[in-house]
């Protein structure tokens, strides 16, 4: 590494001397010498760029004080600038010198000077050889006109691209595909310059009629990286075009979201919601093609984690943000619901899509029964070889899992016989892989536990041990994992809603949380419950206070 640094310094001095000689005398011999050495000079520039991109602008100036002179001499040498490759690498190197947040007038002047050099290169790219003579004739100094020239040039190119997009098959008025491709390549190092935003947007939105993508992959990657790191801000229409035209960028955006969720605090849905909204993915997912890719990546995450509750909660929050974005979208641009969920019953999707807030609370029970009937029909009464299956129905259901979380509350708040439809809904939600016999067994176990809990709610005294004992009653066999999780959540709901449950809540949770995994599960349940109550406007000060106290105490222990 040290040897590479020494070699680069020696090469730097050699090429600085060469450029000075070429600059001082424009003779036939110097022109021939320039052409003879262009390929070697380009190789030096590539090495120079690899070194510069690892430094900040201040370090670059400290290490190479005359770097500006070297690049300027190269940029004003027509025999070097005549090569597209030279233009591209020179732009890359110049962008490494830009100070994103100038702290003094010197840094601001350097940025203005770089803008001027970039304008000169772009002028050469567009074959505007008369630009310099024209501005000199008007009496303007470079520092005055170059920033404005860059902005106007960008706006002109953006306008030309928009016209190109509108002209469609009118080949006489369309910009050549090679030129569009060249523009996208030149833009790569300029992506984070605010003045270039209109051109970036126009390139993304401009769709050619060519059978293959004409924009450079490096352009898509650079734009996507800048968006993810919040270095640029583009209209949603441009972001959607980016992710539609370049699938790897969409996949990287999803992976970037996953990384943020993994590195953040566990079981905090408010923070998850902020990350999801900040990603722009719910808004972009209003386009079915993007939604399907995003949903497929969620599906893979769910399968790889064996249905982890945290993944399910994240899918539910994403779906909630997506539905909100869908409601705000223009009605003229809306797609049929079937395009988002092609493997499930449209009538089931329509019912699940209803927001509980828009339904009177007195009708929640009836809606839950209707959801159960539709799901049961799709899962148990489907014809052989029909599209979808139990998993697809369950996968759709968990998108709108708020309905499932309401079932336990509805059962515990009613003194009537537990409706079979609601018992089936709970059994299916917690055990999607179960067959009919296993699901029926879970329903019997849950019904027995509910009976004991309702009886205990009328008792004058409750004990943590009694409640823990009840959790294992109603069956002569050991509870399977899905049933255990379901009954734990029933007990937690009972503690939050039953008048006597508040006094023994902590003791019961202490007995329940005998592993770190179950502790995290309880934390997730409490956080999700508070999040849902807040969203639905459910007011229960006593229950809410208890849930917050339990959540706070449990988080200190993990």
UniProtKB/Swiss-Prot annotation:
Protein name: Fanconi anemia group C protein
GO cellular component term, pick one: nucleus
Assembly: Belongs to the multisubunit FA complex composed of FANCA, FANCB, FANCC, FANCE, FANCF, FANCG, FANCL/PHF9 and FANCM. This complex may also include HSP70. The complex is not found in FA patients. Interacts with ZBTB32. Upon IFNG induction, interacts with STAT1. Interacts with CDK1. Interacts with EIF2AK2; interaction between FA variants and EIF2AK2 may lead to augmented EIF2AK2 activation and cell death.
Top-level taxon in the UniProt lineage: Eukaryota
Main localization of the protein described in the UniProt heading: nucleus
InterPro entries the record matches: FANCC
Disease: Fanconi anemia complementation group C: A disorder affecting all bone marrow elements and resulting in anemia, leukopenia and thrombopenia. It is associated with cardiac, renal and limb malformations, dermal pigmentary changes, and a predisposition to the development of malignancies. At the cellular level it is associated with hypersensitivity to DNA-damaging agents, chromosomal instability (increased chromosome breakage) and defective DNA repair.
GO-annotated biological processes: cellular response to oxidative stress; DNA repair; interstrand cross-link repair; nucleotide-excision repair; protein-containing complex assembly
Tissues expressing the protein: Ubiquitous.
Cellular localization per UniProt: Nucleus; Cytoplasm
Keywords: Cytoplasm, Disease variant, DNA damage, DNA repair, Fanconi anemia, Nucleus
Gene designation per UniProt: FANCC
General function of this protein: DNA repair protein that may operate in a postreplication repair or a cell cycle checkpoint function. May be implicated in interstrand DNA cross-link repair and in the maintenance of normal chromosome stability. Upon IFNG induction, may facilitate STAT1 activation by recruiting STAT1 to IFNGR1.
């Amino acid at each position: 590494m040290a040897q590479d640094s020494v070699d680069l310094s020696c090469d730097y001095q050699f090429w600085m001397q060469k450029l000075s000689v070429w600059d001082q005398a424009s003779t036939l011999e110097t022109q021939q010498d320039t052409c003879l050495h262009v390929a070697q000079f380009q190789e030096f520039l590539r090495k120079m760029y690899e070194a510069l991109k690892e430094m900040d602008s201040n370090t670059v100036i400290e290490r190479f004080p005359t770097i500006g002179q070297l690049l300027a001499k190269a940029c004003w040498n027509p025999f070097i600038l005549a090569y597209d490759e030279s233009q591209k690498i020179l732009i890359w190197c110049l962008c490494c010198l830009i100070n994103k947040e100038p702290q003094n007038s010197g840094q601001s002047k350097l940025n203005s000077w770089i803008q001027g050099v970039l304008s000169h290169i772009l002028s050469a790219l567009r074959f505007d050889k008369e630009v310099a003579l024209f501005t000199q004739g008007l009496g303007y100094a470079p520092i005055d006109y170059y920033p404005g020239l860059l902005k106007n040039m960008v706006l002109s190119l953006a306008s030309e691209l928009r016209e190109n997009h509108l002209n469609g098959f009118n080949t006489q008025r369309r910009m050549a595909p090679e030129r569009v491709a060249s523009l996208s390549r030149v833009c790569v190092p300029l992506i984070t310059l605010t003045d270039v935003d209109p051109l970036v947007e126009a390139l993304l939105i401009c769709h050619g009629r060519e059978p293959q993508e004409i924009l450079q992959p490096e352009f898509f990657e650079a734009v996507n990286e800048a968006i993810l790191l919040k270095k640029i801000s583009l209209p949603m229409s441009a972001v959607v075009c980016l992710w539609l035209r370049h699938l790897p960028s969409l996949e990287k955006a999803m992976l970037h979201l996953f990384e943020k969720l993994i590195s953040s605090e566990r079981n905090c849905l408010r923070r998850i919601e902020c990350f999801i909204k900040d990603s722009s993915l719910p808004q972009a997912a209003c386009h079915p093609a993007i939604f399907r890719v995003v949903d497929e990546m969620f599906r893979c995450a769910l399968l790889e984690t064996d249905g982890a509750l945290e993944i399910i909660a994240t899918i539910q929050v994403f779906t909630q943000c997506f539905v909100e974005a869908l409601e705000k979208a223009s009605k003229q641009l809306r797609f049929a619901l079937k395009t988002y969920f092609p493997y499930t019953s449209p009538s089931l999707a329509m019912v699940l899509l209803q927001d509980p807030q828009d339904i009177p609370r007195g009708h929640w029970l009836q809606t839950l029964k209707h959801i159960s009937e539709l799901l049961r029909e799709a899962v148990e009464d489907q014809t052989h070889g029909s599209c979808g299956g139990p998993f697809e129905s369950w996968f759709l259901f968990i998108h709108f899992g708020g309905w499932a979380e309401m079932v336990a509350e509805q059962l515990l708040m009613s003194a009537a016989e537990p409706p079979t439809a609601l018992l089936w809904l709970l059994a299916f939600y917690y055990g999607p892989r179960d067959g009919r016999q296993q699901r029926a067994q879970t329903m019997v176990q849950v019904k027995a536990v509910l009976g004991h809990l309702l009886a205990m709610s009328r008792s004058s005294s409750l004990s943590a041990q009694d409640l823990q004992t009840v959790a294992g009653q109603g069956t002569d066999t050991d509870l399977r994992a899905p049933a255990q999780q379901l009954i734990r959540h029933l007990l937690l709901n009972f503690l939050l809603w039953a008048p006597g449950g508040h006094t023994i809540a902590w003791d019961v949770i202490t007995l329940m949380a005998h592993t770190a995994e179950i502790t995290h599960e309880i934390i997730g349940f409490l956080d999700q419950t508070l999040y849902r109550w807040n969203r639905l406007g459910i007011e229960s000060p006593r229950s809410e206070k208890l849930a917050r106290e339990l959540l706070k105490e449990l988080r200190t222990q993990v």
